[in-house]
């Protein structure tokens, strides 16, 4: 290959650079291009002053959003601050509201139980990395959260199953008019922090991100990963490869630029707004050109049409994201932690088997966390 695309864990990139398989992009692309990126984005890809990969595409993150309007409609007020709080909220919903509420637990509960387990796993891994310690899963607050999850899981899986069955049969007894929790499932191939339309911004104004820790006052971290590009040291065309990487970096989607460039705050015009505004200008010019030839009634009709068009224009956002959305995006990004370890995305068979044994009741929580710690260390 000339250019390699892979998913961070950066361990994989550093391993390949140690073997001499990757070119140092600082020498190849120039510091000015690369130093414009967020330092925390580049740090896991650096080794001994060299940079051996660059990010590509919008990050994938693990984060749920809370719909405050739905929460209040259920007579609840407390926004979860810890994973224990979140699981208590889910348990309260399943016990008190699931059978007869018009508010669904989530906008898409399918796979929610597995997503929650994954989120706990990633959050503990992120906490260890951010603290500079080896991955461990024996911390008391993580073990307590895992116990709470194991107790909650059967009811949550049952809710998922019934919700999906009733939704597919159009009965809708569990409701689909809104979600108390918006589930943002994270995929290794497609960034999924929002539904499918934005990045770290909520889909509705009354949604708030659940920035959770394992204990009160603990670190608020959003585990994050993204794809990276690297250049084969044996490439016959390193300069061409560097030019292509520079082009890809400069022409990434707006979401990706927001996530990777700290100073990228320029508002991107909304094409729909631009097109509508230009049409109004064209229509106004046409009206002024022929106004003298129109009857009073025709003039009134034309002016009413223009007035309605201007009013409609005010309903279209002038930019893809507002300045406030960009600010919120970067504020949330400050809590994001780029996962450096690669085993969690590599489909480690030992981890998968151990997880399944835990969920099937074939091993205790104590055995699980001890064995998991042994595997990852």
Model-identified regions with their sequence ranges:
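Extracytoplasmic/periplasmic solute-binding protein
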Residues: 47-57, 62, 85-147, 178-187
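Hinge/lid segment of periplasmic solute-binding proteins
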Residues: 11, 15-63, 206-212
């Amino acid at each position: 290959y000339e250019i390699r695309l892979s998913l961070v864990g950066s361990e994989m990139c550093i391993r390949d650079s140690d073997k001499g398989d990757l070119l140092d992009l600082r020498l190849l692309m120039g510091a000015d291009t690369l130093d414009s990126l967020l330092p925390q984005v580049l740090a896991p890809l650096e080794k001994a002053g060299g940079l051996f990969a660059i990010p590509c595409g919008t990050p994938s993150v693990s984060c749920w959003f809370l719909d405050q309007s739905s929460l209040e409609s259920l007579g609840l007020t407390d926004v979860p601050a810890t994973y224990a709080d979140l699981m208590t909220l889910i348990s309260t919903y399943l016990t008190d509201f699931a059978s007869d509420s018009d508010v669904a637990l989530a906008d898409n509960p399918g796979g929610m139980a597995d997503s929650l387990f994954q989120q706990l796993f990633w959050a503990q891994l992120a906490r260890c990395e951010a603290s500079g310690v080896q991955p461990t899963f024996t911390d008391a607050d993580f073990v307590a959260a895992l116990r709470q999850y194991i107790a909650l899981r059967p009811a949550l899986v049952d809710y998922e199953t019934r919700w999906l069955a009733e939704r597919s049969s159009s009965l809708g007894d569990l409701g689909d008019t809104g979600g108390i929790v918006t589930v943002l499932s994270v995929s290794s191939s497609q960034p999924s922090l929002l539904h499918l339309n934005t990045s770290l911004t909520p889909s509705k104004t009354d949604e708030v991100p659940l920035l959770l820790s394992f204990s009160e006052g603990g670190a608020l971290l959003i585990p994050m990963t993204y794809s990276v590009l690297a250049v084969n040291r044996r490439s016959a065309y390193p300069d061409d490869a560097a030019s292509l990487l520079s082009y890809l970096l400069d022409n990434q989607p707006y979401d990706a630029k927001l996530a990777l460039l700290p100073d990228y705050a320029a508002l991107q015009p909304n094409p729909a707004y631009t097109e509508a505004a230009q049409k109004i200008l064209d229509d106004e010019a046409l009206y002024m050109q022929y106004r003298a030839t129109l009857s009073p009634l025709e003039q009134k009709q034309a002016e009413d049409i223009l007035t309605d068009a201007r009013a409609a224009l005010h309903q279209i956002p002038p930019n893809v994201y507002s300045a406030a959305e960009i600010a919120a995006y970067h504020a949330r990004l400050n809590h994001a932690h780029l996962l450096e370890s690669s085993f969690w995305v590599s489909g480690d068979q030992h981890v998968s088997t151990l997880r399944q044994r835990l969920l099937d009741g074939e091993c205790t929580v104590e055995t699980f966390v001890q064995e998991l710690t042994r595997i990852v260390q």
